[in-house]
Amino acid sequence: MKPYLFDLKLKDTEKLDWKKGLSSYLKKSYGSSQWRTFYDEKATSELDHLRNNANGELAPSSLSEQNLKYYSFLEHLYFRLGSKGSRLKMDFTWYDAEYSSAQKGLKYTQHTLAFEKSCTLFNIAVIFTQIARENINEDYKNSIANLTKAFSCFEYLSENFLNSPSVDLQSENTRFLANICHAEAQELFVLKLLNDQISSKQYTLISKLSRATCNLFQKCHDFMKEIDDDVAIYGEPKWKTTVTCKLHFYKSLSAYYHGLHLEEENRVGEAIAFLDFSMQQLISSLPFKTWLVEFIDFDGFKETLEKKQKELIKDNDFIYHESVPAVVQVDSIKALDAIKSPTWEKILEPYMQDVANKCDSLYRGIIPLDVYEKESIYSEEKATLLRKQVEETETANLEYSSFIEFTNLPRLLSDLEKQFSDGNIFSNTDTQGQLMRDQIQTWCKFIQTNEFRDIEEQMNKIVFKRKQILEILSALPNDQKENVTKLKSSLVAASNSDEKLFACVKPHIVEINLLNDNGKIWKKFDEFNRNTPPQPSLLDIDDTKNDKILELLKQVKGHAEDLRTLKEERSRNLSELRDEINNDDITKLLIINKGKSDVELKDLFEVELEKFEPLSTRIEATIYKQSSMIDDIKAKLDEIFHLSNFKDKSSGEEKFLEDRKNFFDKLQEAVKSFSIFASDLPKGIEFYDSLFNMSRDLAERVRVAKQTEDSTANSPAPPLPPLDSKASVVGGPPLLPQKSAAFQSLSRQGLNLGDQFQNLKISAGSDLPQGPGIPPRTYEASPYAATPTMAAPPVPPKQSQEDMYDLRRRKAVENEERELQENPTSFYNRPSVFDENMYSKYSS
């Protein structure tokens, strides 16, 4: 038996100019001056050449390669454009496959990229069937593989390209072609077994495979049967006859081998019934055998079937005497589909990878907006990862620097080495006490030179400034209720922040006052040293510990060097991580996965971020090792100090040393809190000055407006003096909007200062170590100016006093602005307390 495969025809097309289409698209997207930056003329010419080859007169194997590559280019472009492929403004023209004279010359033109893809995919499937036909006499296995690929292509077409104007691409027709390819691949599998030596063990296998082949041809037959008589059947007319013949023939073949299987199991009666059914189906196929006579030996199979029938009937009559069922259950034969088709994506995958780099160059100017949005989300994920590592690294570096600075480790090790290198196990110098004394001296200098060292005085200053502001605000008329409310709200917020700030240093006022007085601090510190014996007894000295101390010092020096190396390694790893994150680009990956959901994209981002884990792990390892090594150094230093002191210490001396350490720790905490207090308090004072200037300026404006109203009661009011917009900055006197209308309009506006307050901010800040949380404070200086609300030009001021007032105010504001620019802070990062949206209840 020889296989017969349907002859599918290719679709024809008209020439296409990709150079014109892509250049036109890029010009519209980037303009005539920039589009060439994203245009690769050589790659575009290669794309035109590739399409011409894909639709040329080449061998099927070469055509398949050209078409698969061309489709890969289309797929990469589709990833970028999606359903917006019509923006290319290109005419894709394709002709229907000519199976009849009625289809000759039928062509369809569309602007969508999906139409070009579907037509190309149709031709790819047809080419696979042509390759299968070429190799059918040499290797069934190769033909089965190509028919399976054709089946996958047609199936993908039927499921993903719907409502096409082309008859070839209509969903029901591509599904019909998919079933034909599937049935033919299954048929080749059966014929491969039939043409080899058949054993009795293969009867049931052939029966099941033939049953599956029959079912597949049944689907094709049903499709042709459903078409009305007045509608032309898709394909050649002989297809229907051939499908009908194969349907009955493989049903007969399945029943025949099932009968042989029953005979092997000594179920002769059922076997005879299935052979009778097989004969009926074979006879049903004979009227449709016209196109298959040269491929299937119908007569030979009929003779074999008749011979087997007679043999079984004779055996049953003389030996078995089993009853023969009148009707057989053909469904009892289980169909076995031997075709496992790969997905179309799997077939295309190697070609997609092969042209990926070329597509990145060719389509680099075509990137959808949603890809940029998703890339920004991924960039934020990377930034979060980097910030975390930077913060951990900075914290570790600060821990290292603080440890080295606090212990003065290099000098300490040098002094200890000198002390014990000559075998001197004891020195009457209290090393630990000397280190404490040096540190306290540094702290005293810091406190005594700081202008905010008197905490009570600073508290009184703040209270006085609040009182000044409240006195001014209480004197303002009711029509300024909105501005008064805003200023009071800012005052309340600043007061709350100051209370937290002062709460940080109040528990340490005693220690701060001590550090502010050299006499008192050294008197107090010396109290802890009075009970230290000035000279020990020689009997208390254990000089056998000298070698051990030197060994410990050697280990500490090694650990100190390792700490320095760890710090350098951590910084180097962080630099590498920053470079990798900055150079990481997943635009291509996002384009390929453009259709994924947010959950799938999140999983994709997590997978992509895993490539940074090695460097992150190395950074974390250096941090962990540093902490462990610092603890080890501390333990060894304690052991050295213990060994270098007397063998036995009185309990009273131990108590004094412990009290001294506690006293030193309290001073350290006090200095930490005062450092935070001293850095934040100037910002608070500056803010109160700003509120005071605003309140004073508002009161002055109201007074001037009142005088103007009284003096011009019977005439239109002149506008307020114009203000220099450059002087309107945070920290200076606030500016009111310039008005060119009468005072009645000014009063009705309520002298609104909302525009001026946009840049003043109060927000909660960062937590303080070893104390209550204190919000970070800053005052961001950004110009705000009143803008005229009417077209009439402002009338210049008439009084010289106002000119002098404006000049003084402008100079003061410029000085404050220059000071803020030289010392910027990060306070008040929340939206401004003067934001109009926060006062909506007053904006009726």
Curated annotation (Swiss-Prot):
Q: Where does the BRO1 domain start and stop, copy by copy? A: 4-400
Phosphoserine-modified residues are 740
Bias (Basic and acidic residues) occurs at: 812-821
Q: Which PANTHER family match?
A: PCD6 INTERACTING PROTEIN-RELATED, TYROSINE-PROTEIN PHOSPHATASE NON-RECEPTOR TYPE 23
**Biased composition range(s): Low complexity:** 781-790
Domain of life per record: Eukaryota
What is the additional note?
Present with 10200 molecules/cell in log phase SD medium.
Subunit structure as annotated in this protein's UniProt entry: Interacts with DOA4 and SNF7.
What InterPro entries does the record tag this protein with?
ALIX_V_dom, BRO1_dom, BRO1_sf
Q: Where is this region: Disordered?
A: 703-734, 763-844
Family matches, as SMART domains = BRO1
**Key words, A-Z:** Coiled coil, Cytoplasm, Endosome, Phosphoprotein, Protein transport, Transport
- A Pfam short name: ALIX_LYPXL_bnd
GO cellular component assignments: cytoplasm; cytosol; endosome; endosome membrane; extracellular vesicle
The protein's predominant localisation is: cytoplasm
- Gene that produces this protein: BRO1
Show the GO MF annotations: deubiquitinase activator activity
Q: What does this protein do?
A: Class E VPS protein involved in concentration and sorting of cargo proteins of the multivesicular body (MVB) for incorporation into intralumenal vesicles. Fusion between endosomes and the vacuole will then target the cargo proteins to the vacuolar lumen. Acts as an adapter that recruits the DOA4 deubiquitinase to the endosomes, leading to deubiquitination of cargo proteins prior to the lumenal sequestration. Its association to the endosomes depends on SNF7 and its dissociation requires VPS4. Interacts functionally with the Pkc1p-mitogen-activated protein kinase pathway.
Q: What is this protein called?
A: Vacuolar-sorting protein BRO1
BP GO terms, sorted: ATP export; intralumenal vesicle formation; late endosome to vacuole transport via multivesicular body sorting pathway; mitochondria-associated ubiquitin-dependent protein catabolic process; positive regulation of protein deubiquitination; protein deubiquitination; protein localization to endosome; protein transport to vacuole involved in ubiquitin-dependent protein catabolic process via the multivesicular body sorting pathway
Q: Which organism is it from?
A: Saccharomyces cerevisiae (strain ATCC 204508 / S288c) (Baker's yeast)
